[in-house]
Amino acid sequence: MKAFPVICLGFAIFSSSICVNINILQQIGYIKQQVRQLSYYSQSSSSYVVVKLLPNIQPTDNSCEFKSVTQYNKTLSNLLLPIAENINNITSPSPGSRRHKRFAGIAIGIAALGVATAAQVTAAVSLVQAQTNARAIAAMKNSIQATNRAVFEVKEGTQQLAIAVQAIQDHINTIMNTQLNNMSCQILDNQLATSLGLYLTELTTVFRPQLINPALSPISIQALRSLLGSMTPAVVQATLSTSISAAEILSAGLMEGQIVSVLLDEMQMIVKINVPTIVTQSNALVIDFYSISSFINNQESIIQLPDRILEIGNEQWRYPAKNCKLTRHHIFCQYNEAERLSLETKLSVAGNISACVFSSIAGSYMRRFVALDGTIVANCRSLTCLCKSPSYPIYQPDHHAVTTIDLTSCQTLSLDGLDFSIVSLSNITYAENLTISLSQTINTQPIDISTELSKVNASLQNAVKYIKESNHQLQSVSVSSKIGAIIVAALVLSILSIIISLLFCFWAYIATKEIRRINFKTNHINTISSSVDDLIRY
C-alpha cells in the first residue's frame, strides 16, 4: 500500500513551507484527480513532409502485372486532381485576370479563395510563401521516388528538414516483397488490392475537407497521423526535438499540416507542418481537484477551493488554464495564467483545516461521491451507502466529513441504487477526527430558493417594524427639540433682560451719585456766599 499524502516538488528548507496535503484534503471532500506537467509552447518554425502515396514493389520472376496498383493509381489521381488544381489557382493566378491581390509582394488568386476571412487569407499567403521550399523539395523527387524506405530524410536548399514518408511501404516491405516469388500473381494482387483499398479509404476520409479548398482547410495532425500510419512517431521525432511523446503532442493538437504541393505524376504530396517550440518547466505541477459535499457540523457543506492549482516548489497559485491544451500527462500553455492565492487558502491547501471555508448546501446536490483510483470517496451521510458484497450498510460517523471505501471494506458498493465494483486499496494510511468551527461555514450559493425567500420576507417585515419605531422616535425627538428651543430662547431673553436691568440700575446709581455731588457743591457755594454776605454786613 503506497502512501502519497503530500505533493511538494521543492525541498522544505524552512519550517513554514507549504505543500499541497492530498491526504487531509481528501478527508474533507477535496479530491486530487490529475497531476500534469506544465509546458509552454509557441509556433516558431515549419517543416515539410513528402508523402509518397504509391509504394514501390520489387520486380518478380513471375513478371506479375498488378491490376490493383493501376486501379489504385487511377482512383488516387481523381482524388488528388481537385486539390492540385486548387493549389495551382491560388499560387499561380492567370496573367490576364485582374482577380488577384498582392500581400507583401505575393500574388494570390482571390477567385480560388472565394469568401475568405482574414485568417484564411493569411493561410493562403503562407501557402504561396511555401512554394519556394516545396519546389526545392520536389526537385529531389527522383531520389524520393527511388527509395524503398518508409521514412527518408532529406535536406533542401534552405536547410529545412523534409521527410519522405511512404505510408504503406512498411507493410509492402515486411510482408509482400518477401512473398513475391513464392505466391501466385493473383493472390499477391488480391492482397495488394486489399491493402491499397483500405489505405484509399483513409485518404478519402483525411482529405475530404481539402477537396473544397486546401488553403481554407488545414489538415489536423490527427488526420495526418491516419495518413502517415505507423510512421507518425518517427516523423514527429524527426521534426520536433523534445522528450515529450508523439502521442501527447498529437493529441494536444499542437501541430497542424497544410498541403502546399501535389505531384500527380509521381503520386507525391508535400505537406507543410507548423512545428511548435516546447519548453517544459520541470518543477511545475498543475493539479486538478474535484470537490464533493461533506458532512460538517451536522449539515451538508462543500469546501471553497479552486478546481485547479499550480504548484512550483512550495508555492501554490490558482491556475484556470482557459487557453491551454490538456493531455493525460501534460498541460501546454502559451503563457502563465497563474493567479495569487490568499494566505488562508494556502493554509487550507496545506491541510490546515481551521483555515478552510465551507459553504452550506440546501436541497438536492448531486456531487456526493467520486471514483478515485479504483476506490470510492462518498458523503455517506447525505446518500445511502450500501455494501452488497459483503452485505451491510456503511455508516459514516459524525466526526468524518466523507468516507473512503476500498477493497478491504467492500467489493460491490451501491450508492443510491448505483452499483460500483471496488478494485483497489486506498492509499490513505491514517484518518483524523476533524474539528471545524461554525464560523468556517458560510452561505454562498443557496439552492433552496423558497427557504431563502421566506428569510428575505421575514427580514423585510422586521425592517418595516424597525422603520416605524424609528419614525416614532424621530417624531418624539422633533417635538422635544421644539420645546427645548423655546426654553433656550426664553432663558436667553431672560438673561438679556437681567443684564439690561443691571446695566440700567448701575447707570441710575451713577447718575444719582453725580447729581448728589453737584447738589453738595451748590449748597457749599451757597453757604460760603451767605457767610461772605454776613461778614460784609457786619
UniProtKB/Swiss-Prot annotation:
Pfam families: Fusion_gly
Site residues (Determinant for fusogenicity and cleavage efficiency), renumbered to this chain: 95
Keywords: Cleavage on pair of basic residues, Coiled coil, Disulfide bond, Fusion of virus membrane with host cell membrane, Fusion of virus membrane with host membrane, Glycoprotein, Host cell membrane, Host membrane, Membrane, Signal, Transmembrane, Transmembrane helix, Viral envelope protein, Viral penetration into host cytoplasm, Virion, Virus entry into host cell
Chief location of this protein within or outside the cell: virion
Membrane topology note: Single-pass type I membrane protein; Single-pass membrane protein
Cysteines engaged in disulfide bonds, as pairs: 324-333, 380-385, 387-410
Signal sequence coordinates: 1-19
Chain ranges on the Cytoplasmic side, renumbered to this chain: 508-538
Origin: domain of life: Viruses
Extracellular compartment spans: 20-486
Function text: Class I viral fusion protein. Under the current model, the protein has at least 3 conformational states: pre-fusion native state, pre-hairpin intermediate state, and post-fusion hairpin state. During viral and plasma cell membrane fusion, the heptad repeat (HR) regions assume a trimer-of-hairpins structure, positioning the fusion peptide in close proximity to the C-terminal region of the ectodomain. The formation of this structure appears to drive apposition and subsequent fusion of viral and plasma cell membranes.
Domain notes: The 2 coiled coil regions form a stable six-helix bundle.
Protein name: Fusion glycoprotein F0
Species: Mumps virus (strain SBL) (MuV)
Lineage: Viruses, Riboviria, Orthornavirae, Negarnaviricota, Haploviricotina
